[in-house]
């Protein structure tokens, strides 16, 4: 690949292995291997933290070169097997709910009432359903509807209003857990919370809440037990919690709220939901799953053919595909209008011109705009130069920029990378001309391949502008849950095989939905720019409609 900028294949907190690599003969199979975690990373330096103490300094000679490779912990597979076994050993009612046994249905307590008043009747309805559900409640959170900032946050407030109610908050990624912690900091009713997890995977702002830090303050087991029992709110990633199931020997939770639930496969989650206390009670009284099956699902290596379930007894219970999350399976089994499910329908993120495509083609027009200031105001670029890029960026909410050059068989496209960098540079100049602050929130760039990500980085580096170092350039999978004022999406489709690989389809009521495209388009708040080869992209019916849609809006 042209250029020598390294591909951004490693991230903070990744587990890695490394070894001396001074000659071509040095490989992982011929050298002593050390395991570590990435503690920090810049353009010219990577800091690794060894996972085990190393007292023999000569084993790591300073003058040597080192190779760093990805590592993985196979305990996650073991935890899934344990989770499936735990489900088989769960209480009869909980197991019946999870596997869809006949005669086992969720129930609700109609006597419960909300403790607070809300301006939105829709939010009040959703919170009341969540409060009254005795077994489980499912909440669909489309892009920008505030599933964490509004729904989860107010659920926590309502549950804390119940005396001695114990709350467990779970998400799939550390980034989502950081966001939950951020929202907890804004809830006056939350006087304390404990986070289960690793130091390097936790944002610095929340490390004082880590369970490991709390235990350091305890002088004996009695103090440790009191600290755990007295705290009503616990937060964790699913993987961290699955590795600390002994917590349920010390504490029972009345409710578990699982964010990003549509990204979690059943074997990963059922173990947690099936956990029992030492006395045999369900360790989690009820569970609330928050997700959106129309956004990115769990990452699965197996093909559709390998994942299909053929056993008729399982299919009759809703088990049709191993790639489907528990959230989606339960949601599809509930009747429309069920008291055990609902959907947030007011989006506060995207300008209406940006939201219109996903709303029309993926959500059947069910979303409405919240009329946030940035959704109803004009673009702030009153001063602009004569440069063609500046004039387009200053006046257009959305645009499709066609590219002609194809890099056949490659996972990068030079023309798209150059145009992407030109758009960013024009946007930066517009910020300067209009006295606006340009930072990491201003623009985000999505591309499907790390080689294309590296090419875009190379083009940005050519401008020599330090502010560009903070711009996030990543895959759509890494962008889920994020937002930027402007999103640039480089399709980087060079041949038909890539066109077939790119989408992530699901179907609902006969409507084909591309979950990757849905996430990519809905990360943008103020502006959205898409680049790609229109001739190739138009062979996909959804992409063809998107191009026409963007061109129509751009011409208005």
Task: For the regions a language model picked out, list residue spans one by one.
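Pre-Walker A (Motif I) flank of P-loop NTPase domains
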Residues: 122, 133-139, 164-165, 232
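Short alpha-helix capping/helix-loop boundary micro-motifs
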Residues: 1-6, 471-473
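Conserved helicase motor core of SF1/SF2 NTP-dependent helicases
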Residues: 161-165, 173-174, 239-241, 247, ...
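Walker A/P-loop NTP-binding motif
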Residues: 148-162, 179, 183-185, 274-275
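Pre-ATPase regulatory/linker segments immediately N-terminal to the P-loop/RecA-like helicase/translocase core
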Residues: 4-128, 132, 182-185, 190, ...
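Conserved helicase NTPase catalytic core signature
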Residues: 169-172, 177, 181-182, 188-254, ...
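Walker A/P-loop
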Residues: 133-157
């Amino acid at each position: 690949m042209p250029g020598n900028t390294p591909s951004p294949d490693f991230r903070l907190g990744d587990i890695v292995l490394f070894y001396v690599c001074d000659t071509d003969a040095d490989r992982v199979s011929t050298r002593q291997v050390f395991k570590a975690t990435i503690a920090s990373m810049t353009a010219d330096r990577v800091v690794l933290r060894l996972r085990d103490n190393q007292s023999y300094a000569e084993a790591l000679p300073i003058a040597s070169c080192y190779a760093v490779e990805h590592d993985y912990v196979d305990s996650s597979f073991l935890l899934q097997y344990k989770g499936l076994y735990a489900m088989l050993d769960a209480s009869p009612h909980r197991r019946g709910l999870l596997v869809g046994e006949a005669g086992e249905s969720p129930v609700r307590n109609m006597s419960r009432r909300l403790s607070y008043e809300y301006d939105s009747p829709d939010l009040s309805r959703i919170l009341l359903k969540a409060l009254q559900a005795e077994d489980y409640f499912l909440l669909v959170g489309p892009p920008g509807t505030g599933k964490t900032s509004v729904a989860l946050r107010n659920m926590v407030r309502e549950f804390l209003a119940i005396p001695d109610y114990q709350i467990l908050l779970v998400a799939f990624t550390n980034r989502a857990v950081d966001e939950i912690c951020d929202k907890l900091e804004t809830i006056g009713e939350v006087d304390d919370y404990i986070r289960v997890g690793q130091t390097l995977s936790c944002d610095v702002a929340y490390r004082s809440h880590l369970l490991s830090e709390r235990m350091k303050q305890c002088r004996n087991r009695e103090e440790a037990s009191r600290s755990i029992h007295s705290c009503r709110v616990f937060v964790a990633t699913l993987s961290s919690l699955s590795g600390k199931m002994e917590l349920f020997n010390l504490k029972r939770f009345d409710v578990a709220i699982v964010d990003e639930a549509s990204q979690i496969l059943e074997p990963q989650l059922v173990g947690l939901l099936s956990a029992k206390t030492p006395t045999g009670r369900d360790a989690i009284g009820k569970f609330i799953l928050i997700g959106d099956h129309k956004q990115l699902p769990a990452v699965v290596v197996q093909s559709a053919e390998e994942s299909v379930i053929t056993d008729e007894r399982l299919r009759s219970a809703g088990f049709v595909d191993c790639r489907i999350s528990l959230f989606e399976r339960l949601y599809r089994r509930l009747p429309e209008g069920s008291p055990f499910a609902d959907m947030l329908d007011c989006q506060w993120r995207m300008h209406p011109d940006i939201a219109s495509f996903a709303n029309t083609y993926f959500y059947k027009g069910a979303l409405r705009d919240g009329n946030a200031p940035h959704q109803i105001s004009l673009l702030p670029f009153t001063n602009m130069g004569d440069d063609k890029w500046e004039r387009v960026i200053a006046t257009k909410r959305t645009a499709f920029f066609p590219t002609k050059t194809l890099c056949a068989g490659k996972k990068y496209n030079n023309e798209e990378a150059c145009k992407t960098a030109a758009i960013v540079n024009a946007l930066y100049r517009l910020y300067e001309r209009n006295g606006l602050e340009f930072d990491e929130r201003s623009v985000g760039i999505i591309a499907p391949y790390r080689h294309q990500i590296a090419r875009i980085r190379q083009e940005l580096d050519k401008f020599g502008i330090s502010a560009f170092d903070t711009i996030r350039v990543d895959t759509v999978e890494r962008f889920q849950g994020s937002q930027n004022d402007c999103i640039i999406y480089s399709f980087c489709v060079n041949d038909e095989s890539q066109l077939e690989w790119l989408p992530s389809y699901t179907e609902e009521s006969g409507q084909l939905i591309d979950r990757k495209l849905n996430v990519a388009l809905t990360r943008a708040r103020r502006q959205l720019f898409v680049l790609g080869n229109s001739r190739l992209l138009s062979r996909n019916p959804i992409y063809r409609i998107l191009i026409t849609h963007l061109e129509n809006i751009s011409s208005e």
